[in-house]
Amino acid sequence: MTDMLIVIDMQRDFVSGCLGSKEAQGIVPAVAARMQRAHEEGTPIVLTLDTHEEDYMETREGRFLPVAHCIRGSEGWTLEPEIGKACCRGMISFEKPTFGSTALMHHVAALAMEKGCISGRGMTIELCGVCTDICVVSNALLIKAALPEADLIVDSALCAGVTPEKHKAALETMRSCQIQVL
């Protein structure tokens, strides 16, 4: 059984908005179905939300990626509608101003401590979402650093990268770091 499903940044701007892609749009039904299955199985679901402020263009990320996106409170910051419909009570979300969420990493580590699995041994954590080559890989590696013995799983069919090539490259990076890629 999976101890946690982590859904990364399935927000409008990354799926159907200013940074969206047909690949990201294509995974929405499968991600929503996976969330529903996790809920039915009693698996905790955690969401991340890329969250920027109005001064985004003045930030380091804004200088390197000059496309204002996921501005707090904007329509693009909200979850893609089908993903929003798949949400249920008890879900936790973490807003993050950058690619990886240290708050998420600490949350997962605390859960491991509660279970008596300080290194993550015996835990299975699944990640999915967008973008494979930016936020998915960043969060997977943060969790791997915090819980080196946990089984981390990334289902490639439930992820989309900036491009198909970058998606594949990120999957290979995660495989190299002993993350199971389906």
Predicted features along the sequence, with ranges:
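Short secondary-structure boundary segments
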Residues: L49, G129, S156-A157
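Histidine-anchored nucleotide/phosphate-binding helix
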Residues: A33-R37, V137-L147
